Amino acid sequence: MSEIHGSVITDDGVRLAYKTVGDGPRNLLLLHGWGGSANSWNAFIRSLDLRKFRAVALDIRGHGDSDKVTTGFTDERFARDALAVADAANARKFISVGFSMSGRFVQYLPLLSPERVEGVVIIAGAPASAMELPEQVITDWAARAGDREKLREVPIMFAVNPDPTLLDEYADDAAKASRYALGATLRMLLTSFEERIKGRSPAIPTLVLAGKADSLLGPDVQKAIAANYPGSRVVELDCGHELLVEKPGEAARHVAEFVGTLPS
């Protein structure tokens, strides 16, 4: 199945790169994790039945082939960016899927356009509540910008059995991310919008995937996230945090099964 690459200019003037793969009736809007890009989803996408799904994967601002800017690093702006990509890709409705830091951003999307979000999938996601991240960690990780080998070390810290080829692909793309973006996205996790999502009605169908051995955002964190979404389901996989380089096929299978339960 061929990839179609495109870009869109947001209403604040930032060019975002994205790609679509597949021509199925269900749109999956895919948001990558820290340092990643649309390519972070390649192994996941290869595991999907693309007669049933259409993957729309974007490079978050400051990452991949998107503009390297120093503005717009807020949860609302990132959600609006994702909607701009969905518009450009003609994905009127979609299931939003976010990995790691983007597990937080996909939680913001229903606050802006609940009628467009058919379901939410949070994969080892960051919570909508404020996290505690030492400034030294933020500084150290951001300082790795442009250094492929040092960036490759980060997912290894939190993975149990990563695929070396997928790690290499991650590192190639992570080297494109700007230093500002690498730091700013981490600082976004220090804020909270949890009160805005608690008790929202109607509830949007939600699936949460957790790595049993995730030392960063493990099962307890994922269960706390799920508690904000009545009727949500938590599935634990035998891996660490880095599901997209450890268990992409299994993650794709669970997402496909979840989407199969949604109204058509």
Spans of model-derived segments:
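Conserved HGGG/HGGXW glycine-rich cap/lid loop of the alpha/beta-hydrolase fold
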Residues: 14-68
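Conserved acidic catalytic loop of the alpha/beta-hydrolase fold
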Residues: 77-94
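Gly/Ala-rich beta-loop-alpha elbow adjacent to hydrolase catalytic centers
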Residues: 98, 102, 106
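Flexible "cap/lid" loop of the alpha/beta hydrolase fold
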Residues: 107-112, 118-147
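Conserved alpha/beta-hydrolase catalytic His-Asp/Glu region
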Residues: 131-132, 147-200
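Short beta-strand/loop motif that positions the catalytic acidic residue
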Residues: 202, 208-210
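Acidic catalytic loop of the alpha/beta-hydrolase fold
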Residues: 212-217
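Catalytic histidine-centered segment of alpha/beta-hydrolase-like enzymes
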Residues: 239-252
